[in-house]
Structures are given as structure tokens and as C-alpha cells.
Amino acid sequence: MKLRAEDVLANGTSRHKVQIDMERQVQIAKDLLAQKKFLEAAKRCQQTLDSLPKDGLLPDPELFTIFAQAVYNMEVQNSGNLFGDALLAGDDGSGSESESEPESDVSNGEEGNENGQTEIPNSRMFQFDQEEEDLTGDVDSGDSEDSGEGSEEEEENVEKEEERLALHELANFSPANEHDDEIEDVSQLRKSGFHIYFENDLYENALDLLAQALMLLGRPTADGQSLTENSRLRIGDVYILMGDIEREAEMFSRAIHHYLKALGYYKTLKPAEQVTEKVIQAEFLVCDALRWVDQVPAKDKLKRFKHAKALLEKHMTTRPKDSELQQARLAQIQDDIDEVQENQQHGSKRPLSQPTTSIGFPALEKPLGDFNDLSQLVKKKPRRH
């Protein structure tokens, strides 16, 4: 059968053949991730992405999400983070320890320095150090008694105010009527040289890979088309993954930003049990990160905690099948409510740098499919520095 011109790539390869091979590589990488062979999974994704033809065949977004999870878990292994919850494909929730191999020590020399390196995507997500969020805009503007203490204090106050304003705008974000400026045109997509993602800060590398997955999932917007239900669902799932990585890296405000973005996408979907569960999960994760953001006033934390508590209680009356998980979440949120109320009376006793507990990390069992967080029923104590 003679192939049509549009079915043949510039190098003479069948477009269909390349697509089939890419799907096979995705499945292999997913299996490696499930086996906790993080370096092998990451290299499989890197080599697949670098080998794709550059003339119009777009990568499967899942190559980027698997790559991101593998790189993230390599960093967890490198840092000896005993409290880090891995983002795994096919995690059965058993909580069994991985037989970690020394595979996370990557040699940069193995890949070599390639010619023709393309620029890293111009992702806006890294602006959030100054553009992070808070839950409300109507916040008292500080108790600064030492006016003129120095430019550092003034800059810090400006950043806090920008954070408050940014989150106030984001709390009601909906992609149905607002442009998502984190989803850039695919022309910004990296084309080759993916070995760089084994270097430097692997947390940020994982986030950048997820940002590229967003470019691919959101690409219909460049043609003025509406995103499909499935695309919005998968974009929401990518934002959850971003939030989980940021939360584990103690970038709590950035995590809240992306959990709220996920909520914005989930709330545009048609009502369904899966959607309801994702909304519940995202609401809980906002609270899980929020407890560590000191810039948010206690009254606004209480609003969010009580909102999540009411959602959980309502959900538990109609969905008893996962009541054990929801009970654990409910107990944690009630603890948060009690702590905020106690702090209002007696002042905070929590060290500023304590990271969060982790209930609800997602696991990919199929392309950005259902999240499996049943392994997180035991509430862990935050690690201390």
C-alpha cells in the first residue's frame, strides 16, 4: 500500500510507524517507573524524545510526565529523603520499601555534549518566587514597626503582597473563561538535548518537564479550539503532579498555586464520580500545603479548612467505599482547624521551616489516569531540620 505524502516524515519514515514505536516506548518507561527503576525510566524517555523526528510529529505528553516522575524520584533517592513520597506508576499502595539501586548517580559524560542544543522552553512557571499566592486579597498589610529598616524588609513585604494578590486572583480561576498563561505555544517545546534534565536541580527539571507536557496538552488553544474534556482532565492531573513535587520540595505557595489550577480545570468537567474524587483530592491538597504558608491570615486558613471539611463530610455520606481514606483526611483537616484556632489564642508554636505531611500523592496507572493515594492513610510527622 502506497503511503500518502502527509503520512511520510522528512527522513522517509512512516508517521504511523514512529507513532507506534513511541507508544511502545511510553509503556516500557511506565513499567520501569512502576518497578522503581527511576534512572532507566528517565533514560528511556530521554532517548525516545531525542530520537523523535523534528519535522512535525509531536511527542506523547506522557513521555514528559513519566520523565518528570523518574527525575523527581532520583532526587528523592539522592537526598536521602526518608519522608519523601514517591510519585510512581502502578503503585499498589502497599507502602513496601523499594530496593533502591545506586541508579540515581547519573554521569553526565555518558550522554556527551551534543551539538545543536535548543533552548529550554520559555516556561512562565518559574516566576512564582515573586508571584506566589495567598487565599485572599483583603489582608492587613503587615505589622511593620521598623519602617526604614532596610530594603530587604521592604522587598520581602512587596513579595508577600504580590503573593496575596496572585492567589486571590487564582482562587476563582477557570480555564473556561480565563486564559491559562502557563500553557505556552508548542513552538516553545524543547526538541532535543534532553540529557540536560539529569543535571543541576532535579526538582526544577521535573517541573520543567511537566510544563512541556502542559504545552502539548493545551495545544488546541493555539488554533482557537476548545479543549476537550479529556484534555482538561489531564491538564488538571499535571498540575496536581506539579503541586506534589513543589510541596515535597517545600515550595508550598507554588504548590497551592498549582493545586488551585487543577481545581479550576476539574470544575469545568461534567459531573462524574471520578471528577468529584479529583476535586476532593485537590481541595485537600490545597489545605495540606496551606498550613505551612505563614503569610496567609488565620481567618482565611480557617475558611479554606472548613470548606474542605464540609466537602469531605458530604462526600463521605454518598461515597462510603473510600471512607477510610476520607476519615484520615478529615482527621488531619480537623487537626489543622484546631491548631489555627489555638494559635489565634496563644500564638504559633510551629517552626517556620517544617515541611508538610503527605496524604494524597498521585500514582499513574494509565496515562494521567486515576490517582491512588490509599498508601497514605498513616499520618506522618513532619521532618525537622
Curated annotation (Swiss-Prot):
Changing E248A: Strongly reduces affinity for dimeric histone H2A and H2B. The modification Phosphoserine is found at S174. Residues 342-359 have a biased composition (Polar residues). Coiled coil: none annotated. GO terms for biological process: nucleosome assembly; subtelomeric heterochromatin formation. TPR repeats lie at residues 186-220, 229-262, 289-322. The N-terminal TPR repeat region contains an acidic patch that is important for interaction with histones. A C-terminal, highly polar region mediates interaction with dimeric histone H2A and H2B, but is not involved in interaction with heterotetrameric histone H3 and H4. This is HAT1-interacting factor 1. It comes from Saccharomyces cerevisiae (strain ATCC 204508 / S288c).
